[in-house]
């Protein structure tokens, strides 16, 4: 079951206007970005966040989920999303704990390639 666009919009709304949050389509689901860092995924109408030491304080006993078979463990943050201020704090500390995204290399055209 794919994530509904309305659920993705709800998650972004809960993140509030102070954070630079967006979602992007990825593999039929959504990646969740804060300051252009992937902090998690929206899969099957569930919010999965990357586990960080800073984010652990937001979970008493985090439920573990996976965006796809064979993926690393992610925390299921569905309950936290419902509480906007807590969710915003969780997103903020998670993004701060993650490294900056690597710059993309510019695409170069191959000589003789046709458009």
Curated annotation (Swiss-Prot):
Protein name per its UniProtKB record: Uncharacterized 12.7 kDa protein in trpE 5'region
Concerning InterPro entries, the annotation shows:
TfoX_N
Source species taxonomy: Bacteria, Pseudomonadati, Spirochaetota, Spirochaetia, Spirochaetales
